[in-house]
Design a protein with these regions (language model features):
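Cytosolic-side transmembrane-helix boundaries in multi-pass membrane proteins
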Residues: 1-38, 217, 224-231, 302-349
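Inter-helical junctions in multi-pass inner-membrane proteins, predominant
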Residues: 45-56, 154, 203, 240-273, ...
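Single transmembrane alpha-helix segments in multi-pass membrane proteins
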Residues: 52-109, 117-135, 276-280, 329
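Hydrophobic alpha-helical segments embedded in the membrane of multi-pass proteins
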Residues: 60-72, 86-93, 114-121, 197, ...
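Short, non-helical or kinked segments that cap or interrupt transmembrane helices
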Residues: 73-94, 128-141, 211, 235, ...
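Pore- or pathway-lining transmembrane helices of multi-pass membrane proteins that form conduits
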Residues: 124-125, 129-154, 162-166, 192, ...
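Transmembrane helix-bundle core of multi-pass membrane transporters
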Residues: 145-205, 305-315, 339-349
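Helix-loop-helix "hairpin" substructures at the membrane interface of multi-pass membrane proteins
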Residues: 181-259, 282-283, 287
């Protein structure tokens, strides 16, 4: 009799655990299952195209997650950053320019990251120091970056060398379906993945992460226990700009291999959607970035193959339409609470 109760209890416990899931978690799991099933189905139908789509997914997701991490550090600190688009664009320009003039991709990356840090500091100076409206401050960065890069853009300039090439990670690169897409990538892609894991641990497990959360939720209370709110917000927003700068360098030197006007193409705003859908956590943002990257890669594959005879304008809208649907669904099935002090300037008393 007792032996027969065990499986029933286990089944009941498992069912209760599933029933305890939030709607958003259930939809996320269901979406992941459907996505994996679609990938395997496509692979069985056409392995070469599936590998190309998965490679494009990782390539697009890398830029998005770098922008999302930039945004989440700022928002966890209480600062809204809609200037990621401008940080991407300006950093891509300086990275490409320095790399083409010096002949060194590494110096190009350093220039891109430095530009991101400088723009992060400017955002901090306007939002934290001058207590300017944070939306306006981010908009200023976007407009300035677009204007400056368009003015100084040299159509005839080329990189003068191959962009960053892929590095195989031994036998892992030979795995079916995911081997080439995940384990045969250029170096900045691997660096971005390492940063995702490191930042996730730091934000959720370190003293710095707890202090960052504190100044984004209750800056006044944080100040009473000795946290310098102004200084930490300055540091966080500036360092977050470095992540966007790395994203710009990645875009110019690894993903595309050149610079063109307005080449960020709205990806900074997509990164904000990725951050929201990933619930302001790096691992969650990377999962969301893979989803959005998949739609971007699918869009590119449709345009290359012209499989379904869909007008190019409608295909180009795909990532942004998916963004609207996903963000709306996230709000419908369990809206995430913003940090209590998000967007509010802090004054020392």
């Amino acid at each position: 009799m007792t032996a027969g109760v065990g499986p029933d209890l286990a089944t009941a416990s498992g069912a209760a655990g599933v029933r305890g899931w939030s709607p958003q978690r259930m939809w996320s799991v269901a979406g992941a299952v459907v996505l994996v099933a679609c990938v395997w189905g496509f692979y069985a139908w056409d392995g070469a195209q599936t590998t190309a789509v998965l490679g494009g997914t990782v390539r697009a997701a890398t830029l998005l997650v770098l922008g999302a991490m930039c945004g989440m550090i700022g928002e966890r600190s209480g600062i809204v950053n809609i200037g990621i688009e401008g940080q991407f664009l300006m950093s891509a320009f300086t990275a490409f320019t320095v790399a083409s003039m010096s002949g060194s991709l590494f110096l190009g990356v350093v220039a891109g990251v430095s530009t991101g840090l400088a723009m992060g500091w400017m955002l901090a100076a306007m939002s934290v120091g001058l207590r300017t409206d944070q939306i306006i401050a981010g908009t200023v960065l976007n407009i300035a970056a677009l204007g400056l890069t368009s003015f100084f853009y040299d159509r005839g300039r080329s990189l003068g060398q191959p962009k960053y090439q892929s590095i195989e990670l031994g036998p892992l690169a030979d795995l079916p379906v995911v081997g080439t897409a995940l384990f045969n990538r250029p170096p900045l892609t691997y660096l971005a993945l390492v940063l995702v894991v490191v930042l996730h641990v730091l934000l959720l497990r370190s003293v710095w992460g707890m202090r960052t959360t504190a100044i984004g939720e209750h800056p006044g209370a944080a100040a009473t226990v000795g946290i310098d709110v102004i200084r930490l917000r300055y540091w966080n927003v500036t360092l977050a700009g470095g992540l966007a700068g790395l994203g710009g360098a990645y875009l110019a030197l690894e993903s595309v291999g050149t610079f063109t006007r307005a080449m960020s193409g709205g990806r900074g705003f997509l990164a904000l959607a990725v951050m929201i859908f990933g619930r302001r956590t790096p691992l969650g943002a990377y999962a969301a970035a893979l989803f959005f990257g998949f739609t971007t890669a699918l869009q590119g594959q449709f345009q290359l193959n012209d499989t379904f005879d869909i007008p190019a304008q409608f295909v180009g809208m795909l990532p942004f339409v998916v963004t609207i649907i996903v963000v709306a669904a996230a709000g419908l099935f369990g809206r995430m609470r913003d940090p209590a002090a998000l967007g509010q300037p802090y004054e020392v008393r």
